[in-house]
Amino acid sequence: MVLVQDLLHPTAASEARKHKLKTLVQGPRSYFLDVKCPGCLNITTVFSHAQTAVTCESCSTILCTPTGGKAKLSEGTSFRRK
């Protein structure tokens, strides 16, 4: 049984399980997305944790709906992480 932990060089698996502020290097887990509308192929920038429903500017279709955490993308939309 090993009782020694290397605090300067943690494993990637242990860092992924920690809270975002308790990791060795703090950082946000949110990001921006380029979402393409399935109807008009217009690209809109959306925040990953959007708190309001985002609609397409030209055809007014709903691109994503808010949930408790991350926003849920609508069916047929394609996205790219920025």
Swiss-Prot record:
- Can you say what this protein is called? Small ribosomal subunit protein eS27A
Coiled coil feature spans: none
Residues that bear S-methylcysteine: 40
Name the lineage.
Eukaryota, Fungi, Dikarya, Ascomycota, Saccharomycotina
**Comment field (misc):** Present with 43300 molecules/cell in log phase SD medium. There are 2 genes for eS27 in yeast.
Cofactor(s) recorded for this entry are: Zn(2+)
Any single biological process term in GO:
ribosomal small subunit assembly
Q: Which SUPFAM superfamilies has this protein been placed in? A: Zn-binding ribosomal proteins (SSF57829)
Instruction: Name the source's superkingdom.
Output: Eukaryota
**Any one of the GO CC terms:** cytosol
Q: Which family does it belong to?
A: Belongs to the eukaryotic ribosomal protein eS27 family.
